[in-house]
C-alpha cells in the first residue's frame, strides 16, 4: 500500500478517535470532580496590564500569539493548587469556555481568580462563579 493511504487513514480515523476520546475524558472529569469556583477576568499582554516584559509570562513562556496559546494567569492561592503548565477546563464562561494552560501569575491582592489572556483588540470581560476543572 502506498504511503498516502496510511496518511489518510491516520488523518480520517485515528485523529478524530483520539479527539473524541479526550472529549469523553474531560466530560467524565466535569461529571465526577468538584470544580474550583472563581472570578474570571481577561487581560492583554501589554505593559499597562503586566510588567515591563508583557510577552513573557511569570513561568517564562514567551507569548507570540495570545489567542492561540490559551493561557490563564492564576491568583497566588490557586497557584498552590495548579503548577505551571497545568491543563484546566473552564465551564460557564460563554465564549471563553474551553481548555487553557496555567502559565502566568496575578497580583497578590487577588484570591480565587483567573485571568484569561486575550488579543489586543478584544474587549475586556469579568464574570463571577466560573467553574474550573484541573484536567
Q: What name fits each language-model region?
A:
Residues 16-135:
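Solvent-exposed, well-ordered loop and adjacent helix/strand elements within mature globular domains
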Residues 1-16:
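Hydrophobic membrane-insertion alpha-helices, especially the h-region
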Amino acid at each position: 500500500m502506498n504511503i498516502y493511504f496510511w496518511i489518510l487513514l491516520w488523518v480520517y480515523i485515528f485523529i478524530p478517535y483520539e479527539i473524541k476520546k479526550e472529549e469523553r475524558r474531560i466530560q467524565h472529569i466535569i461529571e465526577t470532580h468538584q470544580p474550583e469556583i472563581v472570578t474570571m477576568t481577561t487581560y492583554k499582554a501589554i505593559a499597562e496590564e503586566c510588567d515591563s516584559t508583557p510577552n513573557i509570562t511569570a513561568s517564562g513562556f514567551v507569548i507570540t500569539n495570545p489567542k492561540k496559546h490559551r493561557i490563564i494567569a492564576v491568583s497566588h492561592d490557586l497557584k498552590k493548587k495548579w503548577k505551571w503548565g497545568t491543563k484546566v477546563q473552564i465551564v460557564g464562561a460563554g465564549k471563553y469556555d474551553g481548555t487553557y494552560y496555567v502559565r502566568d501569575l496575578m497580583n497578590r491582592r487577588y484570591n480565587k481568580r483567573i485571568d484569561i489572556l486575550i488579543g489586543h483588540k478584544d474587549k475586556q470581560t469579568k464574570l463571577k462563579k466560573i467553574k474550573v476543572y484541573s484536567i
